[in-house]
């Protein structure tokens, strides 16, 4: 936190500030220790460096030239000789011999390197963990195909959007690879190493990602949840809400959840649970005409089982896997928090950390947990009555299984109610400035 000229950092006990005159300057950085080929990264204005990622500073044109050179096979080959242990200190990097090209070649190098930076940035910004994320690629690329007679009410297929996105990713992948190989050729020629080094780059060494159907569908689901909570909006690009005053007028096409609590149930008990909201989002985003086909595409991607409907597959994903995937994406610092009663899935609900307030847990308990409990009690009463009637062996066995499941859920939810009541009564508040890890 460098607010107020780094006041908190400078006054933190044991804090050591080094080279602060270089803070926020344009630079190239690299990791001191690498298990693979060293990689040099471009950092535009506005970043602070640390000792784990050492930096090079200078004029923009020089930095761009050095970025192209240092990421070439010429320098990676030299560094294997200079530092066979793959420990890259300033000494090894500063000992790299730099041969400057003529002006015409410098211009070519600059164009190739800056285009590569642009491609890498576009790739990174397509993921919601980027500060510059605008919208999900499958939303952006849906415009490639449309269905319907009314241009104002077209429907779109997620499958088509994915194929369009995939073509775009493949094109950028090939362009980046070609550019890197051309840079290798240029620097190999400058250093006179044509007989020692070949310019070819393996696909595994290209750092942008190709399209992946499962990853893109899961990230679309994550983006959808973000829209449910108001983190994102279909009306505006980028991050819409991460604290401060919540403005409901910024969510016209798809309304953000009003109370910041979205229940996750293993069956369709309510019309406002996460699966129903998800279906609404897909319909609003891609159209009514293609809704079922789009749900099928999503379910098949997630691994639809035998007799499952597409909705059941999507529900299973939300119940069992969504939160785990979310924690992986955000490196165990989730911004969506899960209220979870336990292994029986008696009660689950998501809340958005940035909209949390001290009344949220009491509301979740009274308006949602107790509603789920009442639903289970009614269902159990129906099953108990059914078991008093004349049933076939198969139907009786199914009813007994249902009875046991509901009893287990009720027991779990009652125990959870006691625990969450203790938290609710404390009316705990959080400070967003403390960060996700502390608050979670």
Features from the language model and the residues they span:
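Basic, amphipathic alpha-helical recognition segments used for DNA target recognition
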Residues: 21, 31-95, 102-105, 111-119
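Terminal accessory regions of large proteins
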Residues: 130, 137, 143-157, 167-178, ...
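Amphipathic alpha-helical coiled-coil/heptad-repeat segments
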Residues: 72, 104-144
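Polyanion-binding catalytic cores of nucleic-acid enzymes and NTP/SAM-utilizing transferases
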Residues: 1-58, 107, 129, 158-170, ...
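Short Ser/Thr-interspersed hydrophobic loop/turn segments at strand-loop and sheet-helix junctions
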Residues: 6-7, 21-39, 66-80, 225-227, ...
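Conserved catalytic-core segments centered on acid/base and nucleophilic motifs
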Residues: 94-123, 176-182, 188-193
């Amino acid at each position: 936190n460098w607010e107020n000229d780094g006041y908190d950092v400078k006054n933190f006990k044991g804090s050591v500030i080094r080279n602060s005159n270089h803070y926020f300057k344009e630079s190239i950085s690299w990791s001191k220790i690498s298990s693979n080929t060293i990689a040099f990264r471009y950092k535009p204005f506005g970043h602070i460096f640390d000792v784990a990622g050492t930096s090079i500073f200078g004029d923009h044109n020089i930095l761009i030239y050095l970025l192209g050179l240092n990421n070439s096979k010429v320098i990676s080959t030299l560094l294997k000789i200079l530092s066979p242990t793959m420990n890259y200190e300033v000494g090894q990097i500063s000992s790299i011999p730099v041969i400057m090209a003529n002006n015409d070649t410098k211009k070519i190098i600059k164009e190739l390197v800056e285009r590569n930076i642009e491609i890498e940035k576009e790739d990174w910004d397509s993921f919601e963990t980027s500060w510059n994320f605008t919208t999900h690629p499958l939303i952006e690329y849906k415009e490639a195909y449309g269905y319907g007679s009314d241009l104002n009410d077209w429907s779109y297929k997620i499958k088509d959007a994915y194929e369009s996105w995939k073509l775009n990713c493949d094109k950028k992948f090939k362009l980046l690879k070609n550019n890197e190989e051309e840079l290798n050729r240029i620097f190999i020629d400058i250093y006179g190493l044509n007989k020692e080094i070949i310019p070819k780059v393996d696909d595994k060494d290209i750092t942008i990602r190709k399209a992946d159907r499962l990853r893109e569908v899961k990230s679309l689901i994550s983006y959808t949840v973000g829209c449910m909570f108001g983190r994102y909006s279909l009306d505006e690009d980028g991050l819409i809400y991460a604290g401060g005053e919540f403005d409901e007028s910024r969510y016209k096409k798809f309304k953000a959840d009003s109370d910041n609590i979205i229940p996750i149930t293993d069956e369709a008990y309510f019309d406002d649970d996460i699966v129903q909201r998800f279906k609404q989002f897909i319909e609003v985003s891609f159209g009514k005409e293609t809704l079922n086909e789009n749900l099928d595409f999503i379910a098949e991607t997630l691994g639809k089982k035998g007799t499952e409907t597409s909705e059941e597959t999507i529900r299973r994903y939300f119940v069992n896997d969504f939160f785990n995937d979310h924690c992986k994406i955000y490196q165990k610092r989730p911004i969506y928090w899960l209220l979870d009663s336990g292994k029986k899935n008696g009660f689950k609900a998501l809340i958005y950390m940035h909209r949390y307030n001290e009344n949220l847990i009491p509301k979740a308990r009274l308006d949602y947990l107790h509603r789920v409990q009442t639903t289970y009690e009614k269902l159990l009463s129906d099953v108990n009555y059914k078991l008093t009637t004349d049933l076939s062996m198969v139907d009786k066995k199914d009813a007994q299984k249902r009875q046991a499941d509901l009893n287990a859920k009720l027991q779990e939810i009652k125990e959870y109610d006691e625990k969450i009541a203790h938290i609710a009564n404390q009316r705990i508040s959080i400070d967003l400035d403390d960060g996700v890890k502390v608050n979670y």
